[in-house]
Structure formats: C-alpha cells, structure tokens
Curated annotation (Swiss-Prot):
Alphabetized GO MF terms: nucleic acid binding
Name the UniProt record assigns to this protein: Gypsy retrotransposon integrase-like protein 1
Domain Integrase catalytic: 135-292
PANTHER family per UniProt: PROTEIN CBG26694 (PTHR37984), PROTEIN NYNRIN-LIKE (PTHR37984:SF5)
Species, as recorded: Macaca fascicularis
Gene Ontology biological process terms from the UniProt entry: DNA integration
PROSITE patterns associated with the record: INTEGRASE (PS50994)
Entry-linked InterPro entries: Integrase_cat-core, Integrase_H2C2, Retrovirus_Pol_polyprotein, RNaseH-like_sf, RNaseH_sf
Length: 522
C-alpha cells in the first residue's frame, strides 16, 4: 500500500532494492520499513526482473517503472492488430493481465481520453440507411425466386428446382435445374421472362456475390441491369414470401417420383394456381388473368371409365386440394386450441370479490366513546398499527368523518374516518369505580346544595334515568357489540340501585339520630 503523497515508482524501486539486497533503500523512511516488508512478500525476482505475484502468488505480472515502458505497454494494449482502439475497461484488463505499476488505472484513463483517434470516433455518428419497402401494387411487378434441392437425379439429369412466385397474385412457376450455378439459374429466369415478361424486381435469399453474378448473366442475356436484389435488405415484408405449402408438397412429390419428378413440375404449378388461397378467396389464376380457366370438374375427362387409371394431373390436383384442406384444418384447430386455452385460463382465474367499504360498521354516533386506529407506526423494525384512546365523538362531518375529543376534552386536529374507529368497552373494575365515584360526588353535592331532596332518592332517580336511556338506546342501536355493552351496563346498574336504596335508609337513620341529639341538647 503506497502512502498518500508518495511516488509510486519510488515505492517499487524500494521494494526491488529490498528483494535484491535484503536491505532498505537509502530513501526509505523508518516509518515505511514495515510497509516495505509486507509489500515485498507479493513480489519475486525472475531472470533479474521483478514480477508481481499477489497474495495468492498465482499472478505473474511484470513490474513497469519507467515512463517509456508504460507508454509502450499502453499503446500495445489500447490498439489491436486490426487498427481498432479498445475502451477503458478492455484496455485496463489487457494491461493488468500482464503488467503492474501503482497508478495503472489512472494512466489507462488518461491515455484513452487523450487518444485522438478515439475522440474522433466517439463524435462520429453513423446513420443507418432507411429501409424502403417495395409496394406490391400490380401483378408480376415483384417476384421471389427460391431454389430447392438437391432431389433424386431424374431421367433428364435434373437435380434442383427453381420456384418463382408473384407476390401480388401468388402465381407460381416451377422449372427444373441441372445445377444451381449462376448461368443455369439465369437461363431459367430468362425462359420465364419470355413467357410473362420481366418484373420490376426479383428478390432472392442468397449471398450477395451469387446475386451479383446472376445480375451480370441477366444483363448479358437480356440486357437488364440490377434486377435481382437480396432478401436480407428488408425491401419486402416477411409475410410476403413463397407459401410453405408449395415447398412441402414439392419435396414430397419429388420423393414419391424420384425418376420423373421434373416432368410434373408444370402440372404442380398449374394445380397450385387454380386452387383457392387465403385471404382473398380468389385463385392466383384469376388474380393474374382476371378470369378462371375452364376446368371440366363435372365431366369424367380427367378420369377414365374404369376409375383406376386416373390422369397424373388429376392426382396432383386432388393431392394439392387435400394438402390445402389439411393446412386449413391445422390452422383452424390451432385457432380453436388457442381460444380454448384462453377460455381455460380465464376460467382458472380466481375472481376475488372485494368487500364493500363499511363507512360506519359499528353505527357510531355523537357522544360514543371510541378507540382510534393509529397506522404506520414504526416499532421493532417494522410498521405497526395500534388502537389508542379512549376518545369521544364530538360531531360527524358531511363526508362521514368523526371529529374527536380526547379524555381531557381537547379536540383533535384532524377528522378520523369512521372505519378507523371502534367502540371503547370498559372493563368491569373501571365501570364500578366510575359509578362509585360518581355516586359519592353526587351525594356530597346534593347534601350541601339540595337538602330538601333525599340523597338516596336523587341518586336512584339518576341511575334509573340512565337505565331508561340505555333501554332507549338499545332500541336505536343495531350492532351486536352495542347490545352486549348495554346489557352489561344494565346488569351493573341494578345492584347499584339496590345498594343506593340501602344507603338511603342508613342516611335517614343517621339524620333522625342527629335530630334527637339536638333536641336533647336544646
């Protein structure tokens, strides 16, 4: 570890001197000797060169001291063989894999920041060219070319097949090929030109070099330039390609007829052109020529009288129709499966019915004693909630919130939702002490201020009135908890009434005895 303000190169020189001689360098301070000894354990000498091996002694990094060697290492690690320049992270990784000095991280950053080539490349923005999709608006304006094979060598030495598909009408032309050289493919394309004319563009999914060779051959044979373009250039939508049904059927047909498959390619292409295709429901033949061909479907011209010797075209046509039906059924079945899966998924969803909000579940009213809920209270490392109180409902706002007063009579600042309140139920000891305390206070007050009213009778009247009020309130309240509270209160009031009647008798007896004493003294 290099102390703050110390030169890193000097630190490495002191370590090298200590490893080589076993003594401290003259520039080493006494306070630095222990650090030099600890750091020297991470270095070794090999072939008179100092290497950093680390604490695990698995590294082997050459120690660089001079500035010239540092610049040479940075130049080699920053530039690769192809002339490209690495960034800070890659350059630092290459330097630290083989070399060591104390300020390697800062030196790499400064080197990359000062590199003129990197600054120019950083400020250069390469804008990708916009892809212009070719619009297919007319028949035989944009066609695709696909090469299939190799198949079994036919009797006429054909091994491959070329498929040309019009993207507007889906018209298909299939021709056999002996090989897939640029000259052979170009000759087949020229033969199709002589039948339908050249299109505006031909799209092929081949290498650029092969496409360039075909363009050269087409220019030599037909005098047209750059008509073939690459499929990877993004000039056509991915949906507008050769139907996969054609390729699948052609592969099967060539495998079933290995010797004369090339004789049936015209029949296969014509059969595809007269069958219905989605989504237009019109045949490619009708799209191409705006009419349907004469097809003797009702007559037996395609079949012999015996029914066994069916013509080849009829077999091909029936097979293609069967393949189309299979594809439609697969598409329909897949759609039904997806719909069924969606239905099952929707059925499997658990519908959680939210409970309606209870604005006043306990039917609380003004004057009731309640507890309020205190939420988001941080305790023991988590948020908690508790019930605090008791409080008395002062009044209820129009929005259904309650304004409370605490036990000292002070009104709380903020209204509380009724759903955050619950009734405060006193314990039995609290209620008994409350009533006894109230009785003693009332008795003293009545004895001093109202001597004409019997004390026990007045207190009994108060308790009876409270009992009747509780009965009236019981008719108004509908909550089960309120009813239990009132029943409990009534059970506590009845013995208190009896006790106060006894107290009344004792009080009158004391008054009588005191009157007798006064008469005797007078």
């Amino acid at each position: 570890m290099v102390r703050s303000g110390k030169n890193g190169d000097l630190h490495l020189k002191q370590i090298a001197y200590y490893k080589r001689t076993g003594e401290y360098h003259p520039t080493t301070l006494p306070s630095e000797r222990s650090g030099i000894r600890r750091a020297a354990k991470k270095f070794v000498f090999k072939d008179k060169k100092l290497f950093y091996v680390g604490e695990d002694r698995k590294q082997n990094r050459l120690v660089i001291v001079s500035e010239e060697e540092k610049k040479k290492v940075l130049r080699e690690c920053h530039e690769n063989d192809s002339g490209a320049h690495h960034g800070i992270s890659r350059t630092l990784t290459l330097v630290e894999s083989n070399y060591y000095w104390t300020s390697v991280t800062n030196d790499v950053k400064q080197w990359v920041y000062a590199c003129q080539h990197c600054q120019v490349a950083k400020n250069t923005v390469i804008v990708a060219p916009k892809q212009h999709l070719l619009k297919v608006e007319n028949p035989w304006s944009l066609v695709t070319v696909d090469l299939m094979g190799p198949f079994h060598t036919s009797n006429r030495s054909h091994v491959y097949a070329i498929i040309m598909t019009d993207l507007f009408t889906k018209w298909v032309v299939i021709l056999p090929l002996c090989d897939v050289s640029a000259s052979e493919v170009s000759k087949a394309i020229i033969n199709i030109f002589f039948l339908y004319g050249p299109p505006q563009k031909i799209i092929m999914d081949q290498r650029d070099e092969f496409i360039q060779q075909i363009n050269i051959e087409l220019y030599r044979l037909f005098g047209i330039k750059q008509i073939v373009i690459s499929h990877t250039s993004g000039t056509v939508s991915p949906m507008e390609t050769t139907p996969s049904t054609i390729k699948a059927f052609l592969s099967k047909h060539c495998a079933d007829h290995p010797n004369n498959w090339d004789d049936h390619l015209s029949a296969v292409s014509f059969a595809f052109n007269v069958t219905h295709l989605e989504p237009t429901k019109n045949t490619p033949y009708f799209q191409m020529f705006s009419r349907n061909p004469y097809m003797p479907e009702t007559s037996d011209s395609l079949h012999d009288v015996d029914g066994d010797n069916t013509s080849m075209f009829a077999k091909i046509l029936d097979a293609i129709k069967e393949a189309d039906e299979i594809m439609e059924n697969k598409t329909t079945s897949l759609g039904q499966m997806e719909n069924n899966n969606l239905d099952e998924l929707n059925k499997s969803k658990i519908i959680v019915k939210k409970k309606p909000k209870q604005l006043n579940p306990f039917h609380l009213k003004v004057g009731h004693e309640v507890l309020r809920q205190r939420k988001n209270w941080w305790k023991d490392g988590r948020f908690q909630s508790e019930w605090v109180g008791p409080c008395v409902i002062d009044y209820i706002t129009e929005s259904g919130c309650a304004v409370l007063r605490d036990n000292t009579g002070v009104r709380l600042k903020r209204p509380i939702k009724m759903s955050h309140l619950k009734p405060y139920i006193r314990e039995s000891s609290e209620q008994e002490s409350l009533y006894l305390l109230q009785g003693s206070v009332v008795a003293d007050h009545d004895y001093i201020g109202l001597p004409e009213i019997p004390v026990g009778a007045y207190q009994a009247n108060i308790l009876v009135e409270d009992a009747t009020i509780g009965i009236v309130d019981n008719e108004l309240l509908t909550s089960s908890k309120d009813r239990e509270l009132l029943e409990y209160r009534n059970t506590k009031i009845s013995p208190l009434i009896d006790d106060h009647s006894t107290l009344e008798k004792q009080t009158f007896s004391l008054l009588d005895s005191s009157n007798q004493v006064l008469e005797y003294l007078s």
